[in-house]
């Protein structure tokens, strides 16, 4: 298969022929239809976050299940899925406490990358996904089925930006209905934090940014008010909007 491989930080990714291992026990091979670009991928490729090379970045993926390994029960061949970077066993302390991101289980895919270059040398599967490729091999816990009528390009966004912003409000902050919520920055994560606050029943959702068009866009995600921090006194406006 083809993959976009980072051979040198700060340089263009190189399209190469690579091989992907077969699905082992509990693993799923997904033929990708769409991969979003997260700023984390850019930071890695630029070398800002370091890391080992060569590597295949990309971790916001959506596609169709091509093959499954033994013991896989949550997805089947032909399913449309979103692929996330979180692997979890579902049984350790972290998982049992409802925090799969802290899963302590070591998976075979953590020990050895399933990606090899044309010379048979290992290529890092970045962020447990390696999504800038035609296919990925992941643990079944990383796959979430979605309806087949959802566009894959839209579904891929669910894999990181949406769950990061939405989950920060609903799972971490646990914002109760009737709250006042302020979200600083209306990028991908910020917009989904706004959406999470709206769905949670927040009475006031204030979007703060320096670009008026982004503030207006935030209102379509549930923001009730917008503040441009370049032209307005943020603290004073928040106090005014919320009644102190």
Task: Please place each PLM-identified region on the residue numbering.
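Short beta->alpha connector loops at strand-helix junctions that form conserved
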Residues: 21, 85, 105-106, 147, ...
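Nucleotide donor/acceptor-binding cores
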Residues: 1, 79, 178-179, 203
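Well-ordered beta-strand positions
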Residues: 80, 134-135, 204, 225
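Glycine-rich beta-strand-centered segment in the early N-terminal region that forms part
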Residues: 21-35, 46-96, 101, 145-149
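NAD(P)H dinucleotide-binding glycine-rich loop of Rossmann-like/cofactor-binding domains
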Residues: 91-184
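N-terminal Rossmann-fold NAD(P) dinucleotide-binding loop
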Residues: 190-191
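Adenosine-nucleotide cofactor-binding segment
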Residues: 183-186, 196-244
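Structural signature of beta-strand start/N-cap positions in the alpha/beta core
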Residues: 71-74, 180, 203-204
């Amino acid at each position: 298969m083809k993959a976009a491989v980072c051979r040198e930080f700060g340089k263009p990714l190189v399209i190469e022929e690579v091989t992907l291992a077969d699905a082992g026990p509990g693993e799923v091979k997904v033929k990708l239809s769409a991969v979003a670009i997260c700023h984390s991928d850019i930071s890695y490729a630029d070398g800002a976050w370091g890391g080992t090379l060569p590597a295949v970045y990309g971790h916001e993926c959506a596609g169709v299940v091509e093959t499954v390994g033994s013991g896989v029960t949550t997805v089947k061949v032909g399913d449309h899925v979103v692929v996330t970077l979180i692997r979890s066993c579902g049984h350790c302390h972290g998982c049992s406490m409802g925090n799969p991101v802290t899963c302590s289980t070591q998976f075979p895919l953590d020990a050895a990358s399933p990606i090899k270059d044309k010379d048979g040398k290992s290529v890092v599967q970045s962020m447990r996904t390696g999504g800038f490729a035609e296919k990925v091999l992941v643990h079944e816990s990383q796959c979430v089925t979605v309806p087949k009528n959802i566009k894959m390009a839209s579904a891929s966004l669910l894999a990181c930006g949406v769950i990061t912003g939405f989950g920060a409000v609903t799972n971490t902050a646990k914002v109760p209905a009737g709250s006042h919520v302020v979200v600083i920055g209306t990028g991908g994560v910020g917009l989904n934090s706004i959406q999470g606050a709206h769905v949670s029943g927040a009475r006031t959702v204030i979007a703060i940014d320096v670009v008026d068009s982004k503030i207006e866009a935030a209102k379509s995600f549930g923001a009730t008010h917008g503040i441009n921090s370049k032209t307005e006194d943020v603290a004073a406006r928040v106090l005014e909007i919320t009644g102190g």
